[in-house]
A protein has these predicted regions:
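A short, small-residue-rich loop immediately preceding and capping a beta-strand
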Residues: 94-132
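Generic secondary-structure signature for well-ordered alpha-helical cores
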Residues: 40, 67, 71, 95, ...
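A glycine/threonine-rich phosphate-anchoring loop and its flanking beta-alpha core
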Residues: 23, 119-211
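Short glycine/serine/threonine-rich phosphate/pyrophosphate-binding segments
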Residues: 32, 55-59, 109-116, 134-138, ...
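Active-site segments that bind and position negatively charged phosphate/pyrophosphate groups
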Residues: 201-317
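C-terminal charged capping/lid subdomain of soluble metabolic enzymes
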Residues: 2-4, 302-381
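ATP/NTP phosphate-donor binding region
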Residues: 2-100, 324
């Protein structure tokens, strides 16, 4: 057998694990009120994990069905971040309550915490998002942060949640800013997947990339109208796009359809204390502009330049950040910015999935010129 034949055989027999979707999704207005039987099948002693605000917001929705199903529940706040210390506290809470399943409520960090502790304790997980800010309620992935809120690493989980309940009535109570951030996070799927996997010939990856393009188009077409009419059918469709469809793309694409520079920029910015007042999707949305600016400056990519101008118009329309100043980082020092770029360019960073090399100085130039007119500040490799 030749080396080429051996390689082809190895590739053909390789085993890939896909965690595409939650086992069940119950969505709709008042979905929680209809989910009693679906929740109760996981056990009798749920531990409800969330942030303090999310726990308070979901209590009127959850408590009636918990009482109806005669479930003995306990609540615990995950803390400020999905960190190793907070996960240790949550594992202790599982043992203390003798929980047989977890109900995660809240936004991205709360749900990541709930999913990961359920994974570690090998018990079922139900996710109930309180906003449309991320697709965390869907995915088999948790992001770990330091106690100071700086991104550290991510953990791939054995499966997606056992039950996902997007209740539009509950999600509508979240500040509109969370949906705007969710739009920013979701739309990044296209700009990152098309770069990291756009040339793949694998069926599922092609499908994931094309779904990301469809997701982008839905958000371009419907976001402004959705934000003007919270609770409307269009609003529900955009909510589905940010929470559900974004998760589908990650599930189908798997580990080979990954984030690129937009999330690398986000990860670097989390190491700056001044960035902690902004949401995940807001930093990612800004990171998309940085990624396109890099393609424009380092490759003279005119399609990237056009896409950046299109996004700037869209961001203005719905209120996504376009500059460091918009992120509340207008007064950071050069040293702080350099630190963020060095972290974003570390050897294991997603930024290296770009088809060209990026060094911190080039990234810094892109980060301070996201709104530059087309054709300005080209940099040669």
């Amino acid at each position: 057998m030749t080396q080429t034949q051996s390689t082809k055989t190895a590739t053909a027999t390789a085993i890939y694990s896909l965690t595409i979707a939650p086992a069940c999704v119950l969505r709709g207005r008042s979905a929680i009120a209809q989910a009693g039987d679906a929740i109760a099948r996981f056990g009798k002693r749920p531990l409800i994990v969330g942030g303090s605000n999310s726990l308070a917001a979901t209590q009127p929705y959850l408590q009636p069905i918990l009482q109806q199903q005669q479930l003995q529940s306990a609540e615990t706040a995950y803390g400020k971040d999905c960190s190793e210390r907070s996960l240790e506290t949550l594992r202790e809470a599982v043992q203390t309550h003798e929980a047989d399943f977890i109900i995660g409520v809240g936004g991205g960090k709360a749900l990541d915490s709930a999913k990961l502790v359920a994974h570690q304790c090998k018990i079922p997980i139900v996710t109930i998002p309180t906003s449309a800010a991320t697709c965390a309620a869907w995915t088999a992935l948790s992001n770990i942060y330091s106690e100071q809120g700086a991104f550290q690493y991510d953990v791939t989980l054995a499966r997606c949640p056992d039950l996902l309940i997007p209740d539009y009535g509950l999600i509508q109570t979240a500040p509109q800013r969370t949906l705007v951030a969710g739009i920013g996070d979701a739309i990044a799927k296209w700009y990152e997947a098309s770069v990291s996997s756009g040339h793949s010939e694998q069926t599922l990856i092609i499908s994931a990339v094309q779904q990301a393009r469809i997701l982008r188009d839905i958000l371009f077409q419907k976001s402004a109208a959705a934000l003007k009419e919270p609770g409307s059918e269009t609003w529900q469709e955009v909510t589905d796009a940010t929470v559900l469809l974004a998760g589908v793309i990650g599930g189908i694409g798997g580990a080979q359809c990954r984030t690129v520079a937009a999330h690398a920029v986000h990860n670097g910015l989390t190491h700056l204390l001044a960035s902690h007042g902004t949401l995940h999707g807001e930093k990612v949305a800004y990171g998309i502009l940085v990624q396109l600016r890099l393609e424009e400056m380092l490759q003279n990519n005119q399609l990237a330049a056009t896409a950046r101008q299109q996004l700037l118009k869209f961001y203005t329309e719905i209120g996504l950040p376009q500059t460091l100043d918009n992120l509340g980082l207008g007064d950071i020092t050069l040293t702080e910015l350099q630190r963020a770029t060095e972290i974003a360019c570390n050897p294991n960073s997603d930024i290296h999935r770009l088809p060209f090399k990026v060094v911190p100085q080039q990234l810094m130039a892109a980060m301070v010129s996201t709104t530059a007119p087309v054709g300005e500040l080209k940099i040669k490799n």
